[in-house]
Amino acid sequence: MAQRTRLGDLLRPLNSEYGKVVPGWGTTPVMGIFMALFLVFLLVILQLYNRSLLLDGITVNWNGLG
């Protein structure tokens, strides 16, 4: 028999919806928006690293990071 703990009692409500699927798209569009924003963020970082995106007055020195 499993031992009951206070932490387990606090976390039990989080697991009460296990296995249930909400019909429809749910929060999928929100996830898609955040994934697109994260992609834009990564592209900006990549362009800064490759010096394809130059910002006036901001010098980028990647040698200090290594």
Swiss-Prot record:
It holds the Pfam family PsbH. Keywords: Membrane, Photosynthesis, Photosystem II, Thylakoid, Transmembrane, Transmembrane helix. One of its GO terms (molecular function) is phosphate ion binding. The chain crosses the membrane at residues 29-49. It is found in: Cellular thylakoid membrane. The keyword Thylakoid applies. GO terms for biological process: photosynthesis; protein stabilization. Gene3D superfamilies: Photosystem II reaction center protein H. The keyword Membrane applies. It comes from the Bacteria. GO terms for cellular component: photosystem II; plasma membrane-derived thylakoid membrane. It is a single-pass membrane protein. SUPFAM superfamilies: Photosystem II 10 kDa phosphoprotein PsbH. Belongs to the PsbH family. PSII is composed of 1 copy each of membrane proteins PsbA, PsbB, PsbC, PsbD, PsbE, PsbF, PsbH, PsbI, PsbJ, PsbK, PsbL, PsbM, PsbT, PsbX, PsbY, PsbZ, Psb30/Ycf12, peripheral proteins PsbO, CyanoQ (PsbQ), PsbU, PsbV and a large number of cofactors. It forms dimeric complexes. HAMAP family: PSII_PsbH (MF_00752). One of the components of the core complex of photosystem II (PSII), required for its stability and/or assembly. PSII is a light-driven water:plastoquinone oxidoreductase that uses light energy to abstract electrons from H(2)O, generating O(2) and a proton gradient subsequently used for ATP formation. It consists of a core antenna complex that captures photons, and an electron transfer chain that converts photonic excitation into a charge separation. This is Photosystem II reaction center protein H.
